[in-house]
Curated annotation (Swiss-Prot):
Domain of life: Eukaryota
Enzyme class: oxidoreductase
Stretch list, region Disordered: 56-90
Alphabetized UniProt keyword annotations: Endoplasmic reticulum, Heme, Iron, Membrane, Metal-binding, Microsome, Monooxygenase, Oxidoreductase
Membrane topology: Peripheral membrane protein
Primary location group: endoplasmic reticulum
Entry similarity comment: Belongs to the cytochrome P450 family.
EC annotation from Swiss-Prot or TrEMBL: 1.14.-.-
Functional description taken from the UniProt entry: May be involved in the metabolism of insect hormones and in the breakdown of synthetic insecticides.
Composition bias, Low complexity: 72-84
Source organism of this protein record: Drosophila melanogaster
Official protein name in the record: Probable cytochrome P450 49a1
Amino acid sequence: MSGLRKTSIALMRRSTSSTTILPHSGGVGGAVSPPSSGVGVATEIEKSIAMQRLRTGESSNPKKLNVSQQPVTSVATTRTTASSLPAETTSSPAAAVRPYSEVPGPYPLPLIGNSWRFAPLIGTYKISDLDKVMNELHVNYGKMAKVGGLIGHPDLLFVFDGDEIRNIFKKEEAMPHRPSMPSLRHYKGDLRRDFFGDVAGLIGVHGPKWEAFRQEVQHILLQPQTAKKYIPPLNDIASEFMGRIELMRDEKDELPANFLHELYKWALESVGRVSLDTRLGCLSPEGSEEAQQIIEAINTFFWAVPELELRMPLWRIYPTKAYRSFVKALDQFTAICMKNIGKTMDKADADEARGLSKSEADISIVERIVRKTGNRKLAAILALDLFLVGVDTTSVAASSTIYQLAKNPDKQKKLFDELQKVFPHREADINQNVLEQMPYLRACVKETLRMRPVVIANGRSLQSDAVINGYHVPKGTHVIFPHLVVSNDPAYFPEPKRFLPERWLKQSTDAAGCPHANQKIHPFVSLPFGFGRRMCVGRRFAEIELHTLLAKIFRKYKVSYNSGEFVYRVNSTYIPQSPLNFKLTLRDE
């Protein structure tokens, strides 16, 4: 590694040019000051290559490098025009299609390409700062940027244009491929094939196996009526968590700084109840050691994935620290979850043998799948997937929404007025009728996930050649849709830094006074749950969990936050690293 570092540093120091000009094909505004941190600083080797290209006439439209020091919510405006052309010709006639080699982006160094950018010590692209990296790519290169030359990984093509994102999604096949996670595919398909076999689930899986699995489960998971059957037990868990919140408040009425960890417990308890008809004991005063182990395993998994997928894949040669942590976390997670899944299946068998009838809310997702398919293995793998992705994501979404409402008391007051109308008192239960009468709460969640999506980007792995933004893009390229950047682009959302739930309330009295309430929102720039056949299958359950808990919190408390602006980091999900010591002041009835 030391030799690699010396080589990279030597290459970066070779040029003494001070000009910062790069070829650029996107439409970006004026230059901004360079950042104070190392993220986004152009290397000397890039300057040298750019000048050489300029002198030889390779670029007919050079532009000055714009390096952003702005927060991710302030991005260059991207012009977009509607297009009715299919994805193969989304931007230009065939005669004007430019080769893939001309797609703008950071230049790869000899031998090590762009992999060095993600390397420790010498790299300028920190994994925890991927939000800033994507913002910088947009500012520097416009509508599209290619990060190629990643050793052991396909090229990453970042698309910052809503119309192009729409065209790619609309073109996708019956079995769309997300950018794969080789580490998870290796775990399921090689390392633990004796357990998973041909039933690998939905996460990190593609092709016929994914298609067959989804066909078996989607009709149960995606039906609105299925999710609504679990409103009563999810209400009970939220009420129990509210009691825990009351005990957590200190003498200043503030929650502990690690309140996000408490939200993990609430989300895990909710997933356990829906998936297995089991209470895991996460919210009990004495706690649950197994629940804590599940949470820690999930957190480790989400930390390890970008370490394995974005850095040089040395784990394929020898077991790196991140790889060992990844495998250990998944093994522990699988073992604990399978123990509880087994108990659920045994109980379901016993209930059936006794002829015991159950209410719809008491039939777990696992039991529904077994009844429909007769495949216990399929039901177990689905439950594992729901546990793996249903805890961290929902918890982070809840924390971000609480923060936005705490920092915008006028919006919180508007929400409270809505809640007062549907809640007879602050301890009232939530049912389907109540949830359907809270459009402003739903808009608050939508606006939060626009500003701070839990998953900052989605993507597809091209299964055939395509033309994107006027460039030929070859099969196998990983196309990334950076929704965090695009949904904070003023071209799509005027005043993107402002928390305006009214944007989502068309033709409603609740939208009165919002200057952007009647704006037509591009349907492909804010997709917090994904799109199409690979959309999150647990979306309806997650929304019920979120809306139920948030309604209870803001009906009972006035929430404020006095610890500055939330700071986020990328840990697979977009997670706040600021303390969550919200102040909760009890409201009058």
